[in-house]
């Protein structure tokens, strides 16, 4: 039984109550009694609204299911379908043109285009690494990944390989020629760097040149009479620091003495309480809240053991430079932090209230996330003995990403929640900013209205292909069998969805005011492919896009030097490339022309992916990790990838493409493979051969067989219940 404390009509888990009173409230000038009474009133007032919104989701889905079932043998009529969605209030009138009015937003959001990390907040080491990923070594990122091929003697090996190192240096020089070109010649031929009369001078043998754009030299860092120094350059609002040390092992091999090129990388980072974490009870939630508090105070630390050495990882300090005219320049040493709360669906046992029937019920998790992440973030707005040495926002804002909202009424509810939380926390109205995840179909179709509902709070919109595809499948579950998962990326609605997000954001005045983001690169080991392909996102007008690691952030940062996103947005402003009918194009299989082996391949791929993710989620509480696919390619998996895989199989099951026996047989084939892929993990519990004794195996099976009945196809209800079951059995 969870130990609880009564706070008014709230029954608060002791672990949460003590954390709030002893750790989070000190330094905020908020009276504990006033705080808890305020929380109780917010919960009491907003719970009915939250439930009403969920009821609306279910009612709309039931009407859509019925419409499709009555027309399953008829050709799809987009005109009739569009009118039906209008009639039931799913597709709403588009509001008149407007411009967002959000104020007090940091430059990282309004002015700087660059990568965005997403990291599970429950893992302190990951969180620290991500916060510190504002700056990253290009040399390390190139040397340690497949961006540099292991051919022509350039293998990584266990010792430093000079052949590979030379290729890294050559690659970096070519990049510098693109981002900060010289007035004449190339960085490749440079033999020295110096500063003369406030200008950067680059020696090319006996000759000398400067930068093609001298204003890109913005600073340097040099100790008196030291050969170890650095040059700070800027391009498209991003910084490049060239480290020079002729005595270093790498610098000795370089004609200029350059030992590394440091790129400003993860400009912003989302600390995630949602899809990448397993927070199923009060203990889990408090672990996340405590890490978030430590990030805002600047005192989060973690003991790390690397190469047999133990050290304490801390948050990086800001970086100081001398400007060309002798002034001082300070740049942030850390990524600007967002926090992603959960959506409107889930509840948490961290706080219980009277359900009205004599039974206690859990409160909506999204409500308490707003309260407690907002409370912790107050410490990131100021420094002091009780607030820590570092700040997050320099403009007094707290940035909260709100996922899985369906339509403008749900966005408006989030804004009302934030306003009420500001009152409880004694914050000025508008302090809590919102990032809108455009990852549900009803939000996509009504995006302009969604943005208008948060016009004075919104700081980003972001597309999320995987969750959005999961909702696409579930919304039209009764329409017929869907195309295969791999074909979804080429479907009509996807391109319309990506284009519409950018165009509507720009029309609402996002340029220079808010982020327009795009989705995650999931193939964590395939960085060469990422470098080749992910440049398409800034080319599409996105000011940020998600990356899975600090290394990926550094490599993706190159794209924002190669593409002037502001210029792209200027060109796109005023366009409306997608139509509603394109967005309404359901990705149905035209005919069931798949061979039996193709069906089996899809089912096996999806079952393996589901098992590989769910077994770590349920058994070990790992919500985001590199999961090998059926071909042993490491993919970054979270609940969004699980949603699409489980929903596709549920759809095929619903329409007779496969049977429940096919699902079970595939799961039993794939479980031994997943067991083998995890054989090196001492904490891993095999699922085979006693499948029905494995809670994780049963969870994976349930996600597929019951997928059509899950609210909007979400995986949280089953995952949370199964994880709690596992924890109860293994206390």
UniProtKB/Swiss-Prot annotation:
Q: Where is the active site?
A: 340 (proton acceptor), 638 (proton donor)
Indicate the quaternary assembly. Answer: Homodimer.
**Lineage of origin:** Bacteria, Bacillati, Actinomycetota, Actinomycetes, Mycobacteriales
Q: Which cysteines are joined by disulfide bonds?
A: none
This enzyme catalyses: glyoxylate + acetyl-CoA + H2O = (S)-malate + CoA + H(+)
The UniProt entry's GO biological process terms, in alphabetical order, are: glyoxylate catabolic process; glyoxylate cycle; tricarboxylic acid cycle
**Protein function:** Involved in the glycolate utilization. Catalyzes the condensation and subsequent hydrolysis of acetyl-coenzyme A (acetyl-CoA) and glyoxylate to form malate and CoA.
State one molecular function term (GO): malate synthase activity
What does the entry list as the binding residues for acetyl-CoA? 118, 125-126, 276, 313, 548
Q: What is its main location?
A: cytoplasm
Q: Tell me the keywords, alphabetical order.
A: Cytoplasm, Glyoxylate bypass, Magnesium, Metal-binding, Oxidation, Transferase, Tricarboxylic acid cycle
Its UniProt pathway annotation is: Carbohydrate metabolism; glyoxylate cycle; (S)-malate from isocitrate: step 2/2
This protein is called Malate synthase G
Q: What class of enzyme is it?
A: transferase
Location comes to: Cytoplasm
UniProt key word Transferase: yes
InterPro entries in alphabetical order? Malate_synth_C_sf, Malate_synth_sf, Malate_synthase_TIM, Malate_synthG, MS_C, MS_N, MS_N_TIM-barrel_dom, MSG_insertion
EC annotation?
A: 2.3.3.9
Q: What are the Cysteine sulfenic acid (-SOH) sites (modified residues) in this protein? A: 624
Residues given in the record as glyoxylate binding sites: 340, 439, 464-467
């Amino acid at each position: 039984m969870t130990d609880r404390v009564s706070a008014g009509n709230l029954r608060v888990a002791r672990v949460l109550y003590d954390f709030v009173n002893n750790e989070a409230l000190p330094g905020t000038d908020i009276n504990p009694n006033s705080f808890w009474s305020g929380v109780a009133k917010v919960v009491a007032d907003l719970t009915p609204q939250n439930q009403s919104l969920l009821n609306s989701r279910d009612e709309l889905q039931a009407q859509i299911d019925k419409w499709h079932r009555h027309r399953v043998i008829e050709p799809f009529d987009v005109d009739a379908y569009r009118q039906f969605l209008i009639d039931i209030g799913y597709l709403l009138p588009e509001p008149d043109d407007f411009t967002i009015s959000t104020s007090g937003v940091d430059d990282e959001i309004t002015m700087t285009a660059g990568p965005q990390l997403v990291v599970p907040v429950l893992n302190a080491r990951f969180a620290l690494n991500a916060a510190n990923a504002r700056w990253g070594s290009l040399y390390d990122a190139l040397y340690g990944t497949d961006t540099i091929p292991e051919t022509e003697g350039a293998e990584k090996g266990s010792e430093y390989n000079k052949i590979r190192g030379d290729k890294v240096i050559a690659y970096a020089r070519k990049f510098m020629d693109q981002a900060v070109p010289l007035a004449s010649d190339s960085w490749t031929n440079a033999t020295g760097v110096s500063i003369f009369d406030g200008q950067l001078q680059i020696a090319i043998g006996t000759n000398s040149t400067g930068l093609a754009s001298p204003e890109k030299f913005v600073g340097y860092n040099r100790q008196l009479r030291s050969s170890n120094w650095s040059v700070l350059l800027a391009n498209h609002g991003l910084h490049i620091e060239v480290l020079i040390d002729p005595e270093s092992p790498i610098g000795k091999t370089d004609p200029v003495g350059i030992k590394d090129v440091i790129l400003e990388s993860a400009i912003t980072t989302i600390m995630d309480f949602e899809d990448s974490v397993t927070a199923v009870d009060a203990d889990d939630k408090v672990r996340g809240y405590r890490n978030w508090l430590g990030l805002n105070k600047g005192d989060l630390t973690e003991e790390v053991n690397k190469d047999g050495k133990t050290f304490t990882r801390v948050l990086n300090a800001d970086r100081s430079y001398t400007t060309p005219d002798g002034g001082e320049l300070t740049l942030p040493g850390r990524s600007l932090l967002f926090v992603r709360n959960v959506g409107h669906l889930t509840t948490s046992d961290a706080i219980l209230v009277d359900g009205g029937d004599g039974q206690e019920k859990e409160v909506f998790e999204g409500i308490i996330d707003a309260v407690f992440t907002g409370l912790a973030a107050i410490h990131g707005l100021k420094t002091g003995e009780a607030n820590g040495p570092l700040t997050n926002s320099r403009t007094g804002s707290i940035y909260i990403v709100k996922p899985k909202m369906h339509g403008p009424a749900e966005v408006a509810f989030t804004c009302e929640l934030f306003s009420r939380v500001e009152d409880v926390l004694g914050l000025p109205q508008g302090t809590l900013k919102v990032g809108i995840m455009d990852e549900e179909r009803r939000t996509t179709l009504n995006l302009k209205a969604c943005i208008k509902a948060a016009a004075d709070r919104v700081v980003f919109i972001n597309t999320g292909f995987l969750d959005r595809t999961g909702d696409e499948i579930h919304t039209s579950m009764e329409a017929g069998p869907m195309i295969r998962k791999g074909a979804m990326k080429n479907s009509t609605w996807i391109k319309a969805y990506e284009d519409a997000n950018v165009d509507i954001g720009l029309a609402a005045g996002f340029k220079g005011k808010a982020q327009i983001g795009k989705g995650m690169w999931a193939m964590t080991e395939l960085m060469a492919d990422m470098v080749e392909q992910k440049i398409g996102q800034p080319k599409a007008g996105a000011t940020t896009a998600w990356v899975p690691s600090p290394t990926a952030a550094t490599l993706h940062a190159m794209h924002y030097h190669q593409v002037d996103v502001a210029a792209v947005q200027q060109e796109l402003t005023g366009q409306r490339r997608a139509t509603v009918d394109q967005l309404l194009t359901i990705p149905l299989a035209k005919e069931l022309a798949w061979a039996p082996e193709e069906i089996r391949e899809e089912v096996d791929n999806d079952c393996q992916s589901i098992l590989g993710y769910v077994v770590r989620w349920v058994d070990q509480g790992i919500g985001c990790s590199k999961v090998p696919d059926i071909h042993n390619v490491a993919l970054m998996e979270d609940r969004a990838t699980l949603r699409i895989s489980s929903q596709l199989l549920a759809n095929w099951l619903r329409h007779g493409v496969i049977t429940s026996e096919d699902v079970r047989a595939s799961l039993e084939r794939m479980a031994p493979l997943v067991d083998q892929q995890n054989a090196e993990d001492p904490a891993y519990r095999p699922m085979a051969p006693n499948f029905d004794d494995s809670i994780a195996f049963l969870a994976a099976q349930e996600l597929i067989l019951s997928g059509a009945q899950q609210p909007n196809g979400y995986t949280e209800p089953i995952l949370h219940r199964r994880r709690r079951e596992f924890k109860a059995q293994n206390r």
